[in-house]
């Protein structure tokens, strides 16, 4: 999407999503999935960050009634690799853009955008770390009458690839290596945004207006986008995600306080589960790589992992973790960490006695 920041803040929520973030990845989806049926009304998992969103038999209604309207919903949580499936009917109207946006605080972004006068296509796009040096990432995919019919738009996002689906059919795949060897690959925790905005507003640049299909005539309002439902799966549920450096790499992200049964797996398929009474963190040189083929049975990661569990109830994980091989630099169970001071005390005490004699 990646457009210049507009003068009106209402447009900024989606029209310039890359220029705005809340910088607070401490709220995350702590369960595997969240399903929202907007035909039943609003949901606690979402917040209207701009404008007024109403609800009816067609689900959430995002309506432009006048200039500067840009109603937008945003999730109250982040996901760190996963799936986002939206059942949407795009809005009609010249210059009107219906958007499904996944966006991170590090300015990574994965998009669907449908303009109001293009009755045969929808745009797929992505950005990494706010890089706008080129605008050659967008690909338009065929879809039938998106303004008149509901279609299911889905993104499956892993550390290896992003795949866009329309009505169950894969239409585009982006491999990690194909995004400047990962440099421009979206890979940090994201929120999901749904909304409508006027790309054809006369205050926008000529290029933006042309891309949106022409200048918007506000005498033709209302323009309404509908979303019936959203299904979100988080491959790495946690209480929070912490950036440990400024690289913007997924390998630098620490998922803290993973939920019970989240099942983070190492490359040799040894499971490490975080009990509900414990806290856990997981970091890896190739951390948190999830694949659609293995989810939800496991979230696959490669080797060189470091796992810490701060609870004696983690003993069931101790034996499994101790068998981890490959290039793993260290593996500590809760029991090992807890007993470490007494272990060193015993060793030094024995050494002192030996030296005394």
From Swiss-Prot:
EC number: 3.2.1.14, 2.4.-.-
GO cellular component terms, A-Z: plasma membrane; side of membrane
Transmembrane segments: 337-357
Signal peptide segment: 1-17
GO biological process: carbohydrate metabolic process; cell wall organization
Active-site residues, Swiss-Prot/TrEMBL: 109, 113
SUPFAM superfamilies named in the record: Concanavalin A-like lectins/glucanases (SSF49899)
Entry comment on modification after translation: The GPI-like anchor contains a phosphoceramide lipid group. The anchor position has not been determined.
GO molecular function terms listed in the Swiss-Prot or TrEMBL record: hydrolase activity, hydrolyzing O-glycosyl compounds
Keywords: Cell membrane, Cell wall, Cell wall biogenesis/degradation, Glycoprotein, Glycosidase, Glycosyltransferase, GPI-anchor, Hydrolase, Lipoprotein, Membrane, Secreted, Signal, Transferase, Transmembrane, Transmembrane helix
Xref: PROSITE patterns: GH16_2 (PS51762)
Alphabetical list of PANTHER family matching this protein: GLYCOSIDASE-RELATED, GLYCOSYL HYDROLASE-RELATED
Name of the molecule in the record: Crh-like protein 1
Protein's organism: Aspergillus fumigatus (strain ATCC MYA-4609 / CBS 101355 / FGSC A1100 / Af293)
Name of the gene: crh1
């Amino acid at each position: 999407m990646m457009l210049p920041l507009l003068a009106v803040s209402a447009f900024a929520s989606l029209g310039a999503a890359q220029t705005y973030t809340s910088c607070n990845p401490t709220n995350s989806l702590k369960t595997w999935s969240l399903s929202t049926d907007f035909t039943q009304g609003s949901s606690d998992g979402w917040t209207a960050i701009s404008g007024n969103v109403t609800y009816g038999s067609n689900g959430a209604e995002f309506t432009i009634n006048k200039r500067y309207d840009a109603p937008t919903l945003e999730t109250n949580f982040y996901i760190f690799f996963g799936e986002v499936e939206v059942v949407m009917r795009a809005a009609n109207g010249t210059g009107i853009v219906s958007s499904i946006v996944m966006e991170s605080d590090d300015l990574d972004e994965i998009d669907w955008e449908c303009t109001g006068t293009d009755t045969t296509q929808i745009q797929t796009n992505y950005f990494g770390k706010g890089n706008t040096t080129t605008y050659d990432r967008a690909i338009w995919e065929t879809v039938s009458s998106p303004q008149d019919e509901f279609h299911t738009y889905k993104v499956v996002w892993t550390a290896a690839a992003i795949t866009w689906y329309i009505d169950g059919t894969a239409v585009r795949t982006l491999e990690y290596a194909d995004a400047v060897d990962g440099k421009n690959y979206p890979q940090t925790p994201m929120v999901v945004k749904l909304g409508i905005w006027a790309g054809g507003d006369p205050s926008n640049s000529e290029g933006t207006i042309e891309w949106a299909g022409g200048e918007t005539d506000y005498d033709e309002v209302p323009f309404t986008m509908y979303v019936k439902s959203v299904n979100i799966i988080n491959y790495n549920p946690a209480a929070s995600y912490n950036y440990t450096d400024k690289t913007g790499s997924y390998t630098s992200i620490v998922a803290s306080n993973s939920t019970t049964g989240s099942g983070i797996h190492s490359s040799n398929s040894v499971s490490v589960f975080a009990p509900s009474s414990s806290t856990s963190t997981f970091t890896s040189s190739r951390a948190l790589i999830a694949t659609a083929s293995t989810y939800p049975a496991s979230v696959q990661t490669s080797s060189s992992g470091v796992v810490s569990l701060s609870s004696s109830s983690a003993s069931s994980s101790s034996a499994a973790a101790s068998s981890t091989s490959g290039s793993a630099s260290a593996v500590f169970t809760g029991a090992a960490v807890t007993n470490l001071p007494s272990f060193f005390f015993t060793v030094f005490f024995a050494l002192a006695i030996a030296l005394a004699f």
